[in-house]
A protein has these predicted regions:
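A general structural signal for short secondary-structure junctions and capping/turn motifs
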Residues: 15, 54-55, 110, 168-171
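Auxiliary Fe-S-binding modules of radical SAM enzymes
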Residues: 153-177
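Alpha-helix N-cap and loop-to-helix initiation/capping positions
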Residues: 44-50, 125, 129, 156-163
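Acidic, low-complexity intrinsically disordered segments
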Residues: 1-63
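Short acidic, gly/pro-rich beta-turn/loop elements at beta-sheet edges
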Residues: 18-19, 34-36, 74, 101, ...
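Conserved SAM/AdoMet-binding glycine-rich loop
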Residues: 54-146, 151-153
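Short catalytic/ligand-binding loop motif for oxyanion handling, primarily in non-cytosolic enzymes
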Residues: 32-33, 43-45, 71-73, 155-157
Length: 177
């Protein structure tokens, strides 16, 4: 497919994810059951594939599409396997900041992570917990942590807009944009 697209004149830069990255799931599942999430099939996170199963040694980078990596109790074993590849890696689904601990922040900030660390801030009701976890993260990282902001799902009225801007304001205050 990629070769066909290149021959048809598509720019390599638009296909680099498929050319430069080994892509797969090391874990699947999530316990949260968020209404907006497509993944409601599982009640917990579990090991899905060993890294070696989708690792292409000819590709310089690794993408992980895990649903909720931090919810998997043995996340550190998988992180060890990722690090053993020697390849820069990135989680593309976002990570669950609410599950951040000192150990997770320290480990992740001492890895060969490629790109931005991206988390989520879906509900204004979680503001105190999100602020606490951003501050925890910043104790270990000089890299900016960015957060997705969900809007327009539960409503599309002025309250939704107000909550969205309140979350953005919090993220701006903590340099997380």
């Amino acid at each position: 497919y990629v070769e066909e697209q290149l021959k048809a004149g598509r720019k390599r830069s638009t296909l680099e994810d498929y050319m430069d990255y080994s892509i797969g799931f090391s874990t699947r599942g999530c316990f949260r059951k968020c209404k907006f999430c497509v993944n409601k099939k599982y009640d917990k996170a579990f090991k899905h594939s060993p890294i070696e199963e989708f690792l292409d040694n000819d590709r310089p980078y690794l993408y992980l599409w895990d649903d909720n990596f931090f919810a998997y109790p043995k996340w550190e074993e998988i992180l060890d396997a990722i690090e053993a590849t020697g390849k820069p890696f990135q989680f593309r689904q976002g990570l669950d900041l609410r599950l951040m601990t000192d150990r997770k922040a320290k480990r992740f900030n001492n890895t060969n992570y490629r790109g931005d660390f991206i988390f989520a801030f879906d509900h204004i009701e979680e503001r105190d917990r999100i602020i606490e976890k951003i501050q925890l993260w910043k104790r270990y990282s000089s890299k900016i942590c960015k957060l997705y902001v969900l809007c327009g799902f539960e409503s599309q009225d002025e309250k939704d807009i107000e909550n969205t801007f309140e979350r953005i304001k919090i993220l701006m205050r903590y340099g997380s944009m």
